[in-house]
Amino acid sequence: MAMQFYTSPEQIMRDRSEYARKNISRGRNTVVLSYAGGVLFVAENISTTLHKISELYDRIGFAAVGRYNEFENLRTAGVRMADTRGYAYDRRDVKARPLAQAYAQTLGAIFTEQTKPFEVEICVAGVGSSPDDDELYRLTYDGSINDEPGYLVMGGQADKLTSVLKEGHNFDLDLTGAFRLALKALSSIGGENGKDRTVGAELLEVAVLDREREGRVFRRILGPALDALMPESSGDAETPDTGGSGQHSDEPSKPDAEGGEKEQP
């Protein structure tokens, strides 16, 4: 009779956590932060069609890192849940927190019940009437949910990027200042010998939840509008600029048509 090997529940959970963290850390980072005019999303993404940032509902955005097919399924489920609630009750009843809680329950169930956990980390962000009313929720592979006031970072070496944001963030930043702070954080890792690197516009996916708009407020920043936000030289990225305003695309995104990038090492 063959001997049955025993693995403790604690060891199983540790192995699953290590597996998920290792694969998430290989991906490119995403930064989300509140600023005077709304909520800004900045992600490293070489794809122009597979999105890591998207809209969930009128005033709610979604960002993710990790395995594309997994967080895309989560995004689609969130859009359906928000649409159903808005149709059954009122569009104003659709808030970021219930969506984040639903994601937490789903991720937690998958982590404990399935053989393989989801290799994802996601953000659900809701824009309020003022920066103090913004909601930023970060959800991890095991269903943990954290309320992150002001800013958050997802992906590998998040601690270092968070320290950069902590030093420079304040709610009075305009769009240009907020973008350059996010760019400074993203540029602070990945260079040779631990130095900063240059991150070009072609490597970025950028969007905002515009506080001043009515209805659907999610807008992507593309082409010339994104180029206008970029610093003229790499040195300009060291200090956020609070003097510019930036522009954004007037075309609303379509929640049912957006996806994300499969993370690359």
From Swiss-Prot:
<dbReference type="InterPro" id="IPR029055">
    <property type="entry name" value="Ntn_hydrolases_N"/>
</dbReference>
<protein>
    <recommendedName>
        <fullName>Proteasome subunit alpha</fullName>
    </recommendedName>
</protein>
<comment type="pathway">
    <text>Protein degradation; proteasomal Pup-dependent pathway.</text>
</comment>
<feature type="compositionally biased region" description="Basic and acidic residues">
    <location>
        <begin position="248"/>
        <end position="265"/>
    </location>
</feature>
<dbReference type="InterPro" id="IPR022296">
    <property type="entry name" value="Proteasome_asu_bac"/>
</dbReference>
<dbReference type="GO" id="GO:0005737">
    <property type="term" value="C:cytoplasm"/>
</dbReference>
<dbReference type="InterPro" id="IPR023332">
    <property type="entry name" value="Proteasome_alpha-type"/>
</dbReference>
<dbReference type="InterPro" id="IPR050115">
    <property type="entry name" value="Proteasome_alpha"/>
</dbReference>
<dbReference type="InterPro" id="IPR001353">
    <property type="entry name" value="Proteasome_sua/b"/>
</dbReference>
<keyword id="KW-0963">Cytoplasm</keyword>
<keyword id="KW-0647">Proteasome</keyword>
<comment type="subunit">
    <text>The 20S proteasome core is composed of 14 alpha and 14 beta subunits that assemble into four stacked heptameric rings, resulting in a barrel-shaped structure. The two inner rings, each composed of seven catalytic beta subunits, are sandwiched by two outer rings, each composed of seven alpha subunits. The catalytic chamber with the active sites is on the inside of the barrel. Has a gated structure, the ends of the cylinder being occluded by the N-termini of the alpha-subunits. Is capped by the proteasome-associated ATPase, ARC.</text>
</comment>
<dbReference type="Pfam" id="PF00227">
    <property type="entry name" value="Proteasome"/>
</dbReference>
<feature type="region of interest" description="Disordered">
    <location>
        <begin position="228"/>
        <end position="265"/>
    </location>
</feature>
<dbReference type="GO" id="GO:0010498">
    <property type="term" value="P:proteasomal protein catabolic process"/>
</dbReference>
<comment type="function">
    <text>Component of the proteasome core, a large protease complex with broad specificity involved in protein degradation.</text>
</comment>
<comment type="similarity">
    <text>Belongs to the peptidase T1A family.</text>
</comment>
<dbReference type="GO" id="GO:0019941">
    <property type="term" value="P:modification-dependent protein catabolic process"/>
</dbReference>
<dbReference type="GO" id="GO:0004298">
    <property type="term" value="F:threonine-type endopeptidase activity"/>
</dbReference>
<dbReference type="GO" id="GO:0019773">
    <property type="term" value="C:proteasome core complex, alpha-subunit complex"/>
</dbReference>
